[in-house]
Regions:
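Class I SAM-binding transferase module
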Residues: 1-314, 320, 328-341, 345, ...
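Pre-Walker A adenine-sensing motif
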Residues: 324
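Conserved SAM/SAH-binding loop
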Residues: 348-349
Length: 624
């Protein structure tokens, strides 16, 4: 039996009170905890900020920083701010006392842990002043502790005399209010407390779209098994694994320091995570922004070619499609006398040529292959392959743009891989429309159809990255162009919540037999939110029919297993939109075409109106 993988799991022991700081750290370490989470001041210590001499005396409200080294403060301690204050009280004295207390503690916490973790417990959605006080000039990471289920909701489920309306306040709304007041500050993250009650699956998925940095586990949600060990219910185990896979988060365990099962809690969490660990093949690309390629305008480099060629699935499917087409076009009685003409438009470094040769070999059909490639650097590679590996094959290499190629004969099969994350965003319609004149009247194109899809999503991590790029622009340029907030991006969206299911947007068929070809498009889509959420933009996908029933897809419901060449497209909104459960989301989407470029435009008309993004391709045109 193989050993479980040694993944890194960081666990902090939460303590309400302690006397000897270094002893507490050593005690936690012996119980397999990496750090401790402690209050900066005793919860019953009410400080005086106005009256002397108490005001001066209360400046010494907590322990000295000399008790630990700066490295220990940073790596072994999470500072917790007082939770017994009310910065949003209607009573001015209470409010001002809360403000002064938290400002004092926050200043000292940042003095201790520099850019480390500071924990703040959120008790309600009435938190505008709390957010203002605690997030201005924040240098470290503020972990906002939020319970997954409102305790009053759980209470209402069991007590007939409980006021359900009071308990119906969703804790996600608490968090959403706080981070909205903080203007989506990237220093503010969630410490999500797992409660005994677990919410509906869709509410869990909504939390997966938030910046969860820590999971808080109280000792009272652990059960005791037959061997007297602390364990979690099956549902909590699955939740634990799900959040770790999505975020790689760390954990905070709330327990009495004298609890004899302290070591069991830590060991059990690590055991569950290691036992259920599955390495994500796309690890490292999580929520990483990439600018979409423009292979028609730019020449790809060797590294980019190599990444695409490593896709374990795509070229097998292309090979199967070409093989099927060859079998259909050349009956068994003609395999010795008939040669099929295959044109590979956009040969790259030869993966499609290799797929065509393999298809010919497996189907036992004779082929002549024209390879058309405009990139002079890729021509060097293709020439070497033809002269060294394929010298006995009937292959002709043409160094030109596929739209300008004038072949001596027409093709039976036209093969290309010009698909982008949104299907047509690498200008496959324009390229194939120009190349389809080389097809025989009964010739086939592989692929023969592509469809793009769109759905609204909540993706604060991606949105924050884009906004940080936008803020780096000079104010004048930012007003004129909104260059980054109106551009499109490719990303492996892991930390995101999909508000509704994707719907089809544009469809392109090849060869295009329309008497007048027009590749501009316009579509209005209507979606509906199931939960309160924040919309940051739209995710784009595509699927494509290569030949007959052989397809490739990055649509979430039909994603081709193992396909790694494409991530989702992301179309941002310049401002986040608060959406309520049951509200309709209406988006207008355009594909615009000019003589020298193509671009997308989009806007929403519900639940509120937005301006039209990327007008005239001002932020991101796709050059022909």
């Amino acid at each position: 039996m193989s050993e479980p993988p040694q993944i890194k799991v960081s666990i902090s022991l939460h303590q309400d009170t302690l006397y000897e700081l270094e002893t507490a750290i050593e005690h936690a370490a012996k119980s397999n905890y990496n750090s401790i989470t402690i209050p900066l001041a005793h919860r019953r210590f009410e400080r005086e900020f106005v009256q002397e001499p108490l005001k001066t005396g209360h400046n010494r409200f907590t322990r000295s920083d000399l008790l630990l080294s700066s490295t220990q403060w940073l790596n072994r301690v999470i500072c917790r701010l007082s939770c017994g204050v009310d910065c949003d009280s209607e009573d001015d004295n209470v409010r001002k006392q809360g403000e002064s207390t938290l400002r004092q503690e926050l200043s000292y916490a940042e003095h201790l842990v520099q850019n480390g973790y500071i924990l703040l417990r959120l008790k309600s959605g009435n938190c505008a002043n709390l957010a203002r006080v605690t997030t201005v000039g924040l240098k470290g990471v503020l972990l906002v502790e939020v319970p997954m289920v409102n305790p009053k909701v759980a209470q209402a489920n069991w007590r007939s005399d409980a006021d359900y309306e009071c308990g119906a306040d969703d804790t996600w709304n608490w968090w959403n209010n706080f981070r909205s007041y903080a203007d989506f500050d990237t220093h503010v993250k969630v410490a999500l407390e797992f409660t005994a009650d677990i919410p509906e699956k869709r509410e869990i998925y909504r939390w997966l779209g938030e910046p969860v940095d820590a999971v808080v586990l109280s000792s009272n949600i652990f059960l005791t098994n037959a061997n007297n060990y602390a364990v979690l219910s099956k549902a909590h185990q699955e939740l634990l694994v799900l959040f770790y896979r999505t975020f790689g988060c760390h954990f905070i365990v709330k327990a009495n320091p004298d609890d004899k099962r302290l070591v069991h809690y830590a060991d059990y969490i690590k055991y569950i995570l290691r036992s259920n660990y599955k390495k994500d093949p796309m690890q490292g690309y999580d929520d990483l922004l990439e600018i979409p390629l423009q292979p028609l305008y730019d020449n790809l480099d060797s590294f980019t070619y190599e990444v695409f060629e490593k896709d374990p699935v795509k070229y097998i499917l292309y090979q199967n499609a070409i093989e099927e087409a060859l079998r259909d076009r050349v009956p068994s009685s003609e395999i010795q006398t008939r040669t099929s003409i295959i044109m590979v438009v956009g040969g790259g470094r030869g993966p499609l040529v290799r797929a065509a040769l393999n298809a010919a070999s497996k189907s036992k059909r004779m082929v002549k292959i024209y390879v058309v490639e405009k990139n002079p650097n890729a021509i060097v590679t293709l020439s070497a392959l033809i002269n060294e590996l394929w010298k006995d094959k009937n292959i002709e290499l043409i160094s030109t743009d596929m739209r300008e190629f004038e072949p001596p004969e027409k093709a039976d099969i036209l093969v290309s891989e010009l698909l982008g994350s949104f299907g047509d965003n690498e200008l496959s319609p324009e390229c194939l429309d120009g190349a389809q004149k080389h097809l025989k009247p009964d010739g086939v194109s592989i692929p023969c159809k592509s469809t793009s899809y769109l759905n609204p999503c909540m993706a604060p991590k991606i949105y924050s990255q884009i906004r940080s790029m936008e803020k780096s622009l000079h104010a004048k340029d930012r007003i004129v162009t909104s260059r980054y907030m109106e551009g499109t991006y490719v990303a492996y969206l892991k930390n995101a919540y999909h508000i509704d299911n994707p719907q089809a947007v544009f469809e392109f068929v090849h060869p295009n037999l329309d008497p007048i070809i027009d590749n501009s498009r316009y579509k209005t889509l209507r979606f509906k939110a199931q939960l309160d959420c924040v919309m940051h933009g739209f995710c784009g996908y595509f699927d494509s029919v290569l030949y007959k029933d052989i397809t490739i897809s990055i649509h979430p419901f039909t994603h081709t297993k193992g396909l790694a060449s494409w991530f989702s497209m992301f179309f941002p909104l310049t401002e986040p939109v608060q959406v309520r459960a049951g509200e309709e989301i209406v988006v207008n989407f355009w594909r615009c075409v000019a003589s020298h470029k193509v671009w997308y435009e989009w806007n929403i008309t519900a639940p509120r109106q937005s301006h039209i993004h990327n007008v005239q391709g001002r932020a991101q045109p796709i050059w022909k």
